[in-house]
């Protein structure tokens, strides 16, 4: 066969049958470096949105309302603790941004990168410690087998009023457990760019007033798409 390689313009390989490709001698590659800045910035944007009611307040105004008192109890990010689950390129970018605005940052990853704690001033901690200490939790791990990383059991270990951000893979967060926690107030708000089903079908979740949502646009910037194109050319030129 002349079919030698599949290149995914982005990070995730969810829409590629990797095992089939491997069995048939077809290489599968992606462009993991290119979208990091854009995805990290979107995660940060969702953090601000959740802290200050930006999404729901804007929607309210478009309905002709002026609900200043309803959205008068926002919170600052400065001084809060951000826990990053998955400390690869995107997690590291977000960690640097968060530290720059005065947040305390901790990280969990099953793989520890030598020297990165000292370089960034961001310590690795165990998952339970991250859950207990974090005011904001942002997920940047690849999809995992065996269930969601953020499930009902782990949400129960979080601070009351925690904010959860997911710009990684929709299956990393148990949507039913998240919705229950939003309704109970255990979770203050959630910022979501990815969903278990895409296009998203969980209307109750993405229409919740305390959910800041976007339709999987993490890498959808002019700059990221330009870098992805360059990375594609680089990969092809080395084949």
What annotation goes with each model-predicted range?
Residues 2-5, 24-27, 103, 160-162, ...:
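A short helix->loop->beta-strand "cap" motif at the edges of active sites that frequently abuts
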Residues 3, 78-81, 152, 161:
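Phosphate-coordination loops involved in phosphoryl transfer and adenosine-cofactor binding
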